[in-house]
Structure formats: C-alpha cells, structure tokens
Amino acid sequence: MENTGSRELVIKEIKLFNKWSYDFIEVRDPSLKKYICLKPVYLPHTGGRHEHRRFGKTHVPIVERLINKVMRPGRNMGKKHLAYHIVKKAFDIIHIKTGENPIQVLVRAIENAAPREETTRIMYGGITYHVSVDVAPLRRIDLALRHLTEGARMKAFHSPIPIEEALAEEIVLAASNDPKSYAIQKKEEIERIALSSR
C-alpha cells in the first residue's frame, strides 16, 4: 500500500523562553561581535561545558552569561532556577517598557556599558605604577554584565523594588546610554581613571 499523502517536516523557530526570537539581532560593535554568542537556544543552560576550554565562554549564550552573573555569592549563590526566572521576568518588563526584542536591548546595553580602557598595576624599580591598557573584548563583556547586575542588586537591596524590575530598568537605561545607569557610570569612571594615568 502506498501512502499518497506527503509529509512535511515543520521546524519551529527556536525562541528564547519560547517568546523572543534571535532573528535580526545585530551587534554594532565590531570588536564584540565575535564574543557575543547569539546561538538560538530554548533554555539558556549549558551546564558549564565551556569551563575547561580556552575562550569557552564565547560559545555560551549571552543570556546565560547574564543569568550566571545574577547568581552571585551570597543570597542567590547556586540558585540558577531563581536567576533564570529573574531574567525571564526582567525580559518581559523590558518588552513592555520599550516594545523591542529584549535580546536586542541587552546586546545594546552591553555595547554601551563595556569599558574600552582601564588601568593595570606595573612594578618598575620597586615602585608600583598604574598604566592605562586596552580592555580585551571578552573582559569588556564580563565587566558590562557584572556592572549591570551589580547596579540592579544595589537598587533592589533594602528597597521595595523587586530585583526583576531593577534589572530591567538597569538594562533599559544602559541600552539608551543614560548616565543614570550604574553600569554607564562605572564605565565612565574606569575610562576617566585610565585617561588620567596614560
């Protein structure tokens, strides 16, 4: 017996949290393009498989890296499920506030909050000097994510504002390059110190 009905293989589009599409997300900063992973995933959880490879972090989805930064030592340490829900709710709030894809808003916030220059300590003849150096792209992303989550944590700590709202607000402010954002303030402070120690 022959089956005359043709079967079509329907591949659903992979969306983050089953809501946000990875299509048309652009990274404007050419130095960060290679290091911001926008590989489509349903659930941003790689289980630390990148850990033992050099530059393994470049293959971890950027949203998972944000989730991992939310999971800081102290109250939220090791609670990835809690951090996952914080970021998920924050993305919903970002979409309500801006009307844009939250992944694109996050990428824009990282580009704006990533410092280009910082200082390092060099010992020369028994005296320590602070010398201005360029920041590696991977470190730029790490610093931007750290400052975004630090700002949200500081805003929500001892405050009636939930962490989800604080994180969403911090990301939106950083995406619009607003000086009220903690991440933008830290970036400008780091670059100002680096400029003075050239």
UniProtKB/Swiss-Prot annotation:
GO terms for biological process: translation. The keyword RNA-binding applies. Gene3D superfamilies: Ribosomal protein S7 domain. Signal peptide: none annotated. It comes from the Archaea. The keyword Endoplasmic reticulum does not apply. It holds the Pfam family Ribosomal_S7. GO terms for cellular component: small ribosomal subunit. SUPFAM superfamilies: Ribosomal protein S7 (SSF47973). Keywords: Ribonucleoprotein, Ribosomal protein, RNA-binding, rRNA-binding. One of its GO terms (molecular function) is structural constituent of ribosome. InterPro entries: Ribosomal_uS7, Ribosomal_uS7_arc, Ribosomal_uS7_CS, Ribosomal_uS7_dom, Ribosomal_uS7_dom_sf, Ribosomal_uS7_euk/arc. Belongs to the universal ribosomal protein uS7 family. Part of the 30S ribosomal subunit. One of the primary rRNA binding proteins, it binds directly to 16S rRNA where it nucleates assembly of the head domain of the 30S subunit. Is located at the subunit interface close to the decoding center. This is Small ribosomal subunit protein uS7. It comes from Desulfurococcus mucosus. The gene is rps7.
